[in-house]
Amino acid sequence: MTTRKYHSPLRSRSATATREAILSSAHTLFLAKGYPGVTIGEIAETAKVAVPTVYSSVGNKPKILTALLEPALTDPAIADSLAAVAASDDPRAVIEVTAEGTRLTHERHWDLVYGLFYRNPPGEPAVKAVLDRGADDYVQALTRVADRLAALDALSADVSPAEAVDLLWFHLGPHAWITLVGEREWSFDRARAWIARAACRALLQDH
């Protein structure tokens, strides 16, 4: 009796292409069925690879989800916005640039941010740790924005630098985008314009 060997159409492709196929398949399945409803076997079948290949190329389900989230956490819009904030002497421009940067980051990764992590959040500790890291990085970025506004002596008299971070989180954090764009179905353009105006009113002494 001969054992039929598994043949993968992707076997001759590079490891990078295989990894991308796995992540793309997982992305589609997670959004369609929810994270808990997807198995490694389904991911392998959709990606046209063997189950062991999924584990060796990316890892288990939490690692796959972490890999999908990583581009949102390291989006170049974040570094670009912070560089522009550091170079600006105009408090309004600082907030406008920050609003645009957070808008771009959310818009580019909206299917994951809203479609998966908000509406049907995975419960694994490993995934929560990555999300917590993302939230911490987000706050650190907004802290740099608040520090720049304080350095420009632009904050309202009743707003301390620490409170400025809280207000930036309130106006520019993920929940603002989820509420306006996801739940209330605003366009990203409309949400960005309102968020920037509201943040200026809340934070700046001359608004």
Predicted regions, residues:
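N-terminal intrinsically disordered/low-complexity leader segments
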Residues: 1-17, 207
